[in-house]
Each structure stands twice: as structure tokens, then as C-alpha cells.
């Protein structure tokens, strides 16, 4: 389904427990983003969970947007150099259950000045050696990665491995930013989110548990609930 002006007008608006105005665009099979300018920068949260997005791009300038939920899509990276300027106050992104496999495809995240919370759980990129250290180094404003707080010792280790900053990278950092997939993702590139859901979630949960969690995810109306359910799916227990 295309993200038409009519679809946007008909989409439900939710006030979540954090008192944030949320635009719910879940489970609409949206293949790419368009027409978001008609929202007139009304929303603090945009929920695009469970669609068919391949890349994160084509956002207009939305100064009020703080949280972006794009879990359970087919996103392989961010292909929009204007995104950091267009979303200047973005604080949190959930990429859970996508197809991101190359650090070069998320390098632009270092330019988000207020990004403090990000999730890459169930993406091929997490199989890379030193993944957590690298993301912590790449995004110096980060406070929480994959539901775990960033520790001071991680920041120290990250600089030892990759250099003082993205402006002064080590050879290891440069090699990880090359346009190549991680070893694991080259062997096992996953293109279907349905296959990912069956393989990654089904093997950890009973059918009854899985059905219950997915039903809860469909009706969740707050960032807190969404993260709780996604964490349960990732950990394999209720």
C-alpha cells in the first residue's frame, strides 16, 4: 500500500503514556515513504512497525519528531544524506528485525546530535566482531544500545579500538566502514521478514507464546509496551 495523503489522514493518532503524540502507520505493507510533509510536523513519534520498507529515506523536515519505530521491515540501511538535518531532534530509533548488514549503511547515524537510544537486535550487523563497541563509538551521544545502557568502560574500549572520533578513525574503524557486509551476513543474507520471524522468533517461543506476543504487538500503543514486547521476542520468554 502506498503512503498516500488519504492513508495518512485516516491513520490513528495516539497519545502514549509518555504524553507523546504518535502517528500509527503499522502493518500497512508500505514499501517506501512519501507525503509525510502533510503531517505538518505534528508528531513526536511515528510508528512504522511491520511494513515493507527497504530503506530509511525521504523524510521532510520534522523538528518535533523524537522517536522512530521501524521494526519488522526489510530495511538495509539509511540512504538519505538529508536525514540528520531533517530530523534534528530525533532521540530514539528501533531497527529491530530488519536486514542491516553493513556499517557503511548506518554511518550517517553519527550526524544525529540527539540520538541516545537505538536498537539493532535481529539484524545481520550484530554478528560482526566488536559490533557493540563500534556502534557506541560511531554514535557518541548514545546512552542505550539494544536495551542495555552504554557503560563508561565500553566508551573507553571503543576509543582504544577505533580512535578518538569518526573524524580521526583507526585503520580498524576504516576497514569496518568499507562497503562490505559482515562475514555472517554474506553467508546468510536474509531477504524476507516473514522467514526471519519464523526462524528467529519461532525457535525461541512456543506457538501459543508467539501468537500472544504478536497480538499484543499489533495493539500496543506506547513506546514502552512496544519495547517490552520486542524484548520478550528477542529473549525468548514472556
Curated annotation (Swiss-Prot):
Subunit structure: Associated with the spliceosome.
Pfam families xref list: LRR_9
Broad class of where this protein is predominantly found: nucleus
Transmembrane annotation, as ranges: none
Naturally occurring in which organism (per UniProt): Debaryomyces hansenii (strain ATCC 36239 / CBS 767 / BCRC 21394 / JCM 1990 / NBRC 0083 / IGC 2968)
Keyword Membrane belongs to the record: no
Domain LRRCT: 123-161
InterPro entries, per database record: LRR_dom_sf, RU2A
GO BP, sorted A to Z: mRNA splicing, via spliceosome
Protein name: U2 small nuclear ribonucleoprotein A'
Keywords of the record: Leucine-rich repeat, mRNA processing, mRNA splicing, Nucleus, Repeat, Spliceosome
Record-annotated disulphide pairs: none
Function statement: Involved in pre-mRNA splicing.
Highest taxon of the lineage: Eukaryota
Similarity annotation: Belongs to the U2 small nuclear ribonucleoprotein A family.
Gene of this entry: LEA1
GO cellular component: post-mRNA release spliceosomal complex; U2 snRNP
Record carries keyword Lyase: no
Matching Gene3D superfamilies: Ribonuclease Inhibitor
PANTHER family: U2 SMALL NUCLEAR RIBONUCLEOPROTEIN A (PTHR10552:SF6)
LRR repeats: 19-40, 42-63, 64-84, 89-110
Subcellular location: Nucleus
Gene Ontology terms for molecular function: U2 snRNA binding
Amino acid at each position: 500500500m502506498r503512503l498516500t495523503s488519504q492513508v495518512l489522514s485516516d491513520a490513528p493518532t495516539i497519545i502514549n503514556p509518555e504524553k507523546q503524540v504518535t502517528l500509527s502507520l503499522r502493518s500497512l505493507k508500505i514499501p517506501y515513504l512519501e507525503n509525510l510533509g502533510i503531517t505538518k510536523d505534528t508528531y513526536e513519534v511515528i510508528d512504522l512497525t511491520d511494513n515493507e520498507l527497504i530503506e530509511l529515506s525521504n523524510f521532510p523536515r520534522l523538528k518535533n519528531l523524537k522517536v522512530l519505530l521501524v521494526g519488522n521491515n526489510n530495511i538495509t540501511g539509511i540512504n538519505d544524506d538529508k536525514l540528520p538535518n531533517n530530523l534534528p531532534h530525533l532521540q530514539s530509533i528501533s531497527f529491530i528485525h530488519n536486514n542491516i548488514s553493513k556499517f557503511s549503511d548506518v554511518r550517517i547515524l553519527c550526524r544525529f546530535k540527539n540520538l541516545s537510544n537505538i536498537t539493532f537486535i535481529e539484524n545481520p550487523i550484530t554478528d560482526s566482531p566488536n559490533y557493540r563497541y563500534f556502534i557506541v563509538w560511531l554514535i557518541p551521544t548514545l546512552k542505550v544500545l539494544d536495551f542495555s545502557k552504554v557503560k563508561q568502560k565500553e566508551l573507553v574500549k571503543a576509543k582504544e579500538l577505533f580512535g578518538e572520533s569518526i573524524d580521526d578513525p583507526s585503520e580498524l574503524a576504516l576497514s569496518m566502514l568499507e562497503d562490505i557486509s559482515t562475514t555472517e551476513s554474506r553467508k546468510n543474507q536474509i531477504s524476507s521478514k516473514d522467514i526471519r520471524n519464523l526462524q528467529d522468533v519461532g525457535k525461541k517461543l512456543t506457538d501459543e507464546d508467539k501468537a500472544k506476543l504478536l497480538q499484543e504487538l499489533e495493539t500496543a500503543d506506547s513506546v514502552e509496551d512496544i519495547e517490552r514486547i520486542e524484548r520478550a521476542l528477542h529473549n525468548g520468554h514472556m
